[in-house]
Regions:
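Acidic, metal/ion-coordinating pockets
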Residues: 2-6, 17-22, 29-408
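Membrane-helix interfacial "entry" motifs
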Residues: 9-14
Length: 408
């Protein structure tokens, strides 16, 4: 029997087919492996964006201007209603101060704002019991960040009128602090959200808020107790504390001994600085233990017109700066700062819970002279500015300030 042999060319063809199949499988396997590696190694665009580091805050500053007595009653209201500008009349030249160059304006509101209550200027002049139309606050909100209510007129319409005033301020997003009765210890200090500019690690600048304790003291009718002054210690280890007292003898060029001792005690109890009003005149200043004390700024928007003493005032420009803070801690402060615009907020408790300590602030002070002669508040002339600085003894005071406080 003969064996049938396969033809050599047929066997060669089968071998080639098997080899080709093997090569294809190897190439496919290698290609699939490379695709998998590429997928794992190169995350999607969205994944890349999600892990990209965010810029960190590196510094913060708030250029803040403090003003003296403000109210919109009595003859201010008469002049306003006689003007085609109506409720915007008292504010009609404030743009000349360059509001856009400041982060915040803070003043003292010296009248309640009760809706529907109309009093003649003659009656208010006779009784010295004031009321301001709440419509003025709709204009005031364009300029002022916060007001102190610690004075001898915010309760002229009783505590009900005072509470209504607080509500109208809230409606107009104007922060407030202080109480006409210094025995109301829970209302003396409040943490406000101080508007600020924040610098970031990528070179950008954004708006933010810094928690700052503002403390209002009414000391005209009764002297604030040591207990009330000591309240500032609760805030002093955590944030800047600004005392804004309303006290002392009126229409005199310098603080008396009693007022001097009271304001100095505020520094001893934790205030970074004291910025006062009430006497209707600009008064002296001093550096006490290196801290600035401004005894009286004078009238800013007021209806007294009979001489230069009552129409000029000293706006106090304070530049709050934080330059060398821990970035993580600064970010935490800024996050809390967003929540501090409400009255009686929980900002101090949040700061304590977060274990934060006071940021390394510096404070630079200067004087912006104002003049409300001819019924309208506006920047002071060079001559009036010079007189204000002389009354304040400003050049001597700023040479005696100590770090972190300085002046110019």
């Amino acid at each position: 029997m003969y064996k049938i042999r396969q033809h050599p060319s047929r066997r060669h063809r089968r071998l080639v087919l098997w080899l080709a199949f093997a090569v294809i499988m190897v190439v496919a396997l290698v290609g699939w492996t490379l695709i998998l590696k590429s997928y794992v190694a190169a995350p999607s665009t969205s994944s890349t964006l999600s892990v990209k580091s965010q810029p960190s805050p590196t510094a913060a500053h708030s250029n803040t201007l403090f003003f003296g007595n403000v109210y919109f009653s009595r003859y201010i209201n008469d002049w306003s209603m006689a003007s085609p500008l109506k409720f915007s009349y008292p504010f009609s030249r404030l743009n000349e101060f360059g509001r856009e160059n400041y982060d915040a304006w803070i003043t003292g509101l010296e009248c309640p704002t009760v809706a529907g209550l109309q009093q003649t200027s003659a009656a208010e002049d006779a009784t010295l019991s004031f009321n301001c139309n709440p419509e003025y606050l709709k204009e005031a909100r364009k300029w002022f960040t916060a007001v102190t209510l610690a004075n001898n007129h915010t309760d002229n319409q009783g505590l009900t009128g005072f509470a209504e005033t607080q509500e109208h301020l809230k409606e107009n997003s104007i922060q407030y602090f202080g109480h006409p009765d210094p025995r109301e210890l829970g209302d003396i200090c409040d943490v406000i959200a101080l508007p600020a500019k924040i610098a970031y690690s990528n070179g950008s600048t954004k708006e933010g808020s810094l928690p700052v304790a503002m403390c209002g003291y009414h000391g005209f009718i009764r002297i604030p107790s040591q207990e009330s002054v000591a309240i500032m210690k609760q805030y002093a280890n955590y944030m800047p504390v600004i005392a804004m007292p309303h006290a002392g003898k009126e229409y005199v060029p310098a603080a008396d001994v009693l007022k001097t001792e009271l304001y100095r005690s505020m520094i001893d109890n934790g205030a970074d600085m004291v910025i006062g009003d009430h006497p209707h005149w600009v008064q002296n200043t001093e550096a006490y233990k290196g801290h600035p004390i401004i005894y009286s700024m004078g009238n800013f928007i007021f209806d007294q017109q009979y001489n230069a003493e009552v129409t000029r005032s000293a706006g106090i420009n304070v530049l709050f700066e934080v330059k060398n803070a821990n970035k993580t801690e600064l970010a935490k402060w800024l996050a809390i700062g967003k929540t501090c615009a409400s009255y009686h907020d929980t900002c101090l408790e949040q700061v304590k819970k977060a274990g934060l300590k006071k940021l390394p602030y510096t404070f630079t002070l200067s004087v912006v002279g104002t003049d409300d002669s001819a019924h309208i508040a506006k920047p002071a002339s060079a001559e009036i500015q010079a007189g204000i600085l002389k009354r304040m003894n400003w050049l001597t005071t700023i040479t005696q300030l100590a770090a972190p406080y300085s002046g110019k």
